[in-house]
Amino acid sequence: MKISLFGYGKTTRAIAENLVDKFGPFDIYDDHFTETKKDTLGNLLLNPNDFDDNLSDIEIPSPGFPPKHKLIQKAKNLQSEYDFFYDIMPKSVWISGTNGKTTTTQMATHLLSHIGAVMGGNVGTPLAELNPYAKLWILETSSFTLHYTHKAKPEIYALLPISPDHLSWHGSFDNYVQDKLSVLKRMNECDVVILPKIYANTPTKAHKISYEDEKDLAVKFGIDTEKISFKSPFLLDAIMALAIEKILLDTLSYKLLNSFVMEKNKLEELKDSQNRLWVNDTKATNESAVMAALSRYKDKKIHLIIGGDDKGVDLSNLFDFMKGFDIELYAIGISTEKMLDYAKKANLKAYKCEVLSKAVNEISNHLRVNEVALLSPACASLDQFNSYAERGKVFKECVNKI
């Protein structure tokens, strides 16, 4: 059986490295490969022009591999990594939505690791490296993965709220939503789906629990929010993690939940040498994440660093939302001019910075002790950085130099 891997990302590399003895050697196609070579394991590294669909039995794309790419168009046996590993997948919880996927996945794993749950998918470990004998897989599941998944399904699907994101990849917001909801049609009567009330009428055989907001979700599961130490925007993530625990174990471990330590790059606070507050929220790559960050600091004047790769999303609503804040903007990245145009239309003061270091220095000239400097860019980072994490690292380095 010949397996072709599309893209040389974390997912496909893990498959090629861990399963070469069982299924390999693999043919790996990537636009960066200009000539045919072999890696150290004997896998072929090929240019997409060399793909012959008649000589391939299965094609597995990296989750973010563009659906309009010529390899996807030619593939006859396309399946996601979830489909590929479905036959050996233990019971699973899939967590999706626009914001909060990672935190909810980590919190749920924190609550359930004592029963043998392991975490993977879009966060941490690719499926090829997860223990197939674990009691439970808790998978952060992206819209990209769901787009390419047509067979696999979870026992529990926890869907956080959906807002516009990755529209240049999906083509439209409706396509994005439909990919998020696509798994429901494969779930059965023994499965459970937790989803926003707006999608409550989506056809499925699974038991549906819909919610309007974090308060409503807490009521549905008998969760006392006063016992949770996390506040918005992380409160919904915490409630969802407890809801998953309640379904599986009929317990609510508040003390264990409150011992969870938040990861870096999400509303990560630090002080400069002048005791001024800076916040690294580099992972806020869409408007709803930025709105949540702004709401957290609504009682302070906010100096917001915004911009990067906007992924084709219209951010007009975000800038309208900003009108209710005492805020100044510092535009960076490939979308600098676009951010300045949004600001002008919304009558918001904005500085043209283009690069992150200049934005930090410009803010430092204006920032007072009772104000907040916030990197919450509403855009992806790949126009200037290798990842959102690198952007956050550079931000903190710049702040520490002040």
Curated annotation (Swiss-Prot):
Pathway participation: Cell wall biogenesis; peptidoglycan biosynthesis
Record Gene3D superfamilies: Mur ligase, C-terminal domain, Mur-like, catalytic domain
GO molecular function, one term: UDP-N-acetylmuramoylalanine-D-glutamate ligase activity
Binding residue positions for ATP: 97-103
EC number(s) from the headed UniProt entry: 6.3.2.9
Keyword tRNA-binding set for record: no
One GO cellular component term: cytoplasm
Major localisation: cytoplasm
Transmembrane segments: none
Subcellular location per the Swiss-Prot or TrEMBL entry: Cytoplasm
Keyword presence, Cell cycle: yes
Catalytic activity: UDP-N-acetyl-alpha-D-muramoyl-L-alanine + D-glutamate + ATP = UDP-N-acetyl-alpha-D-muramoyl-L-alanyl-D-glutamate + ADP + phosphate + H(+)
Family matches, as HAMAP family: MurD
Function, in words: Cell wall formation. Catalyzes the addition of glutamate to the nucleotide precursor UDP-N-acetylmuramoyl-L-alanine (UMA).
Similarity remark: Belongs to the MurCDEF family.
Name under which the protein is recorded: UDP-N-acetylmuramoylalanine--D-glutamate ligase
Gene: murD
